[in-house]
From Swiss-Prot:
Family: Belongs to the bacterial ribosomal protein bL35 family.
Recorded name of the encoding gene: rpmI
Basic residues composition-biased segments: 1-17
MF annotations from Gene Ontology: structural constituent of ribosome
PANTHER family named in the record: 54S RIBOSOMAL PROTEIN BL35M (PTHR33343), LARGE RIBOSOMAL SUBUNIT PROTEIN BL35M (PTHR33343:SF1)
Record's protein name: Large ribosomal subunit protein bL35
Listed HAMAP family: Ribosomal_bL35
InterPro entries (alphabetical): Ribosomal_bL35, Ribosomal_bL35-like, Ribosomal_bL35_CS, Ribosomal_bL35_sf
Pfam families per UniProt: Ribosomal_L35p (PF01632)
GO biological process: translation
GO CC aspect terms: cytosolic large ribosomal subunit
């Protein structure tokens, strides 16, 4: 049977042109009043998926 793409991963992770995986950082959605502004600034922007997780994420995306 054909493997299906994991729809949760599909929504959260984007593949760059060079093949790296980009994801948004956690802890910046809600309850931001209690968090220091330095922390929320640091959590801005995307970060890459760790090397340990890339194989698993690629499999969930249906690649390899």
């Amino acid at each position: 049977m054909k493997q299906k793409t994991h729809s949760g991963i599909k929504k959260r992770i984007k593949k760059t042109g060079s093949g790296k995986l980009r994801r948004e950082q956690a802890n910046r959605r809600h309850l931001l009043e209690g968090k220091p502004s330095t922390r929320t600034r640091r959590l801005k922007g995307d970060t890459s998926v760790s090397r340990n997780d890339t194989k698993r994420v690629n499999r969930l995306l249906g690649e390899g």
